[in-house]
Amino acid sequence: MKLTVLVGGVGGARFLLGAQRLLGLGQFATPDDNARHELTAVVNIGDDAWIHGLRICPDLDTCMYTLGGGVDPQRGWGHRDETWHAKEELARYGVQPDWFQLGDRDLATHLVRTQMLRAGYPLAQITTALCDRWQPGATLLPVSNDRCETHVVVTDPTDQQQRAIHFQEWWVRYRAELPTHSFVFIGTETASATTEVTAAIADADVVMLAPSNPVVSIGAILAVPGIRAALRATRAPIIGYSPIIAGKPVRGMADACLSVIGVDTTAEAVGRHYGARAATGVLDYWLVAEGDQAEIDSVTVRSIPLLMSDPEATAQMVRAGLELAGVTV
């Protein structure tokens, strides 16, 4: 089976780990299972930024480190056994920004990526090269080789004027607490999805939307030209998972993002935001948490346990989605 999943960072990486657990891939691989299934992740690049002259791709790296067995288990991002000497030395020099953490081991990834970008390699090819070191057991594809950054229009606290700041500054520095007016996906007017991404969607037996942030992760992927058309054209069933349980995001600040675009923080509202593929949206099936309800025209909804407490629990989420769509592993 070919499974293609649209993902963000920490939550998306954990969802992929559960898919690997179910399919027997990556660190859960067996010789028989490894030949029968393929897992491809279409990864958000809206969080990508230039920091200290280096190109940072947080969601790609989180997926790569998690599936490769090297992620910090407490934070859910960055390197295991990380040290922070470079960050401390930069602070002594007074270098800005001082609110974004880059660990010493993590810097190696960003140095390699930046060198390859400056040598003319596209991001997809660079990601493949980085994955050669980590062996994630899945194909990780940036949604585009082009610049597609999420920026946020806020009220500047210094002069009360509206201005756009990078998503990382809004999310990490200000913790989404500034008066916020809109999200802008910079570069999408000229960007396009890679041919590898559209092929992964077209050739899939099943497509899933991970329970990642519906605005700045999945939403940023959907904003890239070519993605919605590919999803609407694929013959594969499209199964989405709610990131909202009992009116609250499982992690992160999805509620802050949803309020900016006028969507309620409920499983039903997020499902309606994605919409039915039978109309103008992208969903065929929608999984919500036990105790939550959702009615979405032309979308089949089921309630299941949705907490990704460990790979086995997440594997059962993936299995439930496949069963709902009538797909047998």
Swiss-Prot record:
Q: Which residues bind 7,8-didemethyl-8-hydroxy-5-deazariboflavin?
A: D61
Q: In which pathway does it act?
A: Cofactor biosynthesis; coenzyme F420 biosynthesis
GO molecular function ontology, one term from the record: LPPG:FO 2-phospho-L-lactate transferase activity
Q: Which reaction does it catalyse?
A: enolpyruvoyl-2-diphospho-5'-guanosine + 7,8-didemethyl-8-hydroxy-5-deazariboflavin = dehydro coenzyme F420-0 + GMP + H(+)
GO terms of biological process kind = F420-0 metabolic process
Give UniProt keywords alphabetically: Magnesium, Transferase
Which cofactors, by name? Answer: Mg(2+)
A Pfam family of this chain: CofD
Residue ranges of coiled coil: none
InterPro entries, sorted: CofD, CofD-like_dom_sf, FbiA/CofD
| Enzyme Commission number, as recorded | 2.7.8.28
Give a short account of what the protein does. Answer: Catalyzes the transfer of the phosphoenolpyruvate moiety from enoylpyruvoyl-2-diphospho-5'-guanosine (EPPG) to 7,8-didemethyl-8-hydroxy-5-deazariboflavin (FO) with the formation of dehydro coenzyme F420-0 and GMP.
Q: What's the subunit arrangement here?
A: Homodimer.
Show the PANTHER family listed in the entry.
Answer: 2-PHOSPHO-L-LACTATE TRANSFERASE
Q: Which family does it belong to?
A: Belongs to the CofD family.
Name of the protein described by the UniProt record: Phosphoenolpyruvate transferase
Name the source organism: Mycobacterium marinum (strain ATCC BAA-535 / M)
This protein's gene is called: fbiA
